[in-house]
Amino acid sequence: MPYRHSLRIRYDECDMQGIVFNAHYLAYCDDAFGVWVEAAMPGAMSFVGNAGSFDVVVKKAVVTWSGALRFRETVDIDCAVDRWGRSSFDVAFRGSVGGAERFAVLTTYVNVSPGTHTPAPVAAAVKSAFGAESR
C-alpha cells in the first residue's frame, strides 16, 4: 500500500543558497520509511530499547534529482514497495512539492533477524502490511 509522509524543510538542512544538502534526501526517505513502518505495523520495528519483530538494513540506495528542495518548502514523500524478493525488497520514494517531482530514491532493504542482523526471509505479515503486490 502506498504511503505519504510530509515534512517542512528547516534552515539547518540547507546551504547558503537555501538548497537542501544532498545527504538530507536519504535522511528524509529514512524518516518516511520509519513512520510508514510504525503506521503499518505498530511496535514491530526492532531498535535500541524496543524488541520488535521486524528489522532491516540498507543494501543500496540510488538518488535521482529532478529539482532542488528549498528552505521552508513542504515536501511530500510517497513510498511504495517496488519489488519483493525472498529476503529483500525495494522501496520507491518520490519527493514532490506542490505536485512537482523533485527527487526519486530507490532503496533496497534486506530483512534481518532482530538482534543477529543475519538475512532472513520477509515474513508474509510484512508483505501484507506493505501491500504484497509490486508497483
Label each residue range with its predicted role.
Residues M1-D76, D82-R135:
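Terminal targeting signals and extreme-terminal segments of soluble enzymes
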